[in-house]
Amino acid sequence: MGYLKKLALFISVIILGIFIIGCDSSSDTAEKAKEDSKEEQIKKSFAKTLDMYPIKNLEDLYDKEGYRDGEFKKGDKGTWTLLTSFSKSNKPGEIDDEGMVLYLNRNTKKATGYYFVNKIYDDISKNQNEKKYRVELKNNKIILLDNVEDEKLKQKIENFKFFSQYADFKDLKNYQDGSITTNENVPRYEAEYKLNNSDTNVKKLRDIYPITTKKAPILKLHIDGDIKGSSVGYKKIEYKFSKVKDQETTLRDYLNFGPSDEDS
């Protein structure tokens, strides 16, 4: 009888040990799943805006509201900020950066901004050379407000299209095995994906911009701020075609919703 009690106790200890190990293993698996889900959290955070792409008529944004928090004043409907820029090194030690910024105020239903032409030098003794040309959006068309004598530049500005107007991210959920970087203290999150040249958005970018490298780009999804949403932080997309010195080639896109500027 004493033997049976000891055997029962021994078996109970073994079962308890297996249970504890199983719990630890389940805990590790759950923790790993939580770790792995950060990529999904980043994609879901971006999907809130990327699901709207392509936004063929930018004025549709007047009727769309983004993430709101305590930073908004009572009655403020918010402002959408768009930016698309293309930067490329055409000469050693120099990077040419061109693009457009547009502010769509949902209170006034007015959209104003500027086209910029920027030259960045490696040599810090040289002044960064940036020119801005004021624009507004009317009837989904870019109207140039400043006098531009260069006809080629004038046409480029008036025919400018934001990446958000032609990009399509319906397959975003299928992007897998991204390189994930997180810093919860800042907070900051990044997911990088190696694309191929058959990607729909990549082909469109190659049609529009003078991308000379044949290398397929890396897509970077970058979040500054709360991954669940924040009007203080921002999100941006980057297509890095080349990071090689004096061959740098990058497309940047930014679409964010935030409080309106009192002066706008």
Curated annotation (Swiss-Prot):
Keywords: Cell membrane, Lipoprotein, Membrane, Palmitate, Signal
Subcellular location field: Cell membrane
Name of the protein described by the UniProt record: Uncharacterized lipoprotein SA0397
Lineage of producing organism: Bacteria, Bacillati, Bacillota, Bacilli, Bacillales
Signal peptide positions (record): 1-22
Family recorded in the similarity comment: Belongs to the staphylococcal tandem lipoprotein family.
Cysteines paired by S-S bonds: none
InterPro entries reported for this sequence: Csa, Csa_sf
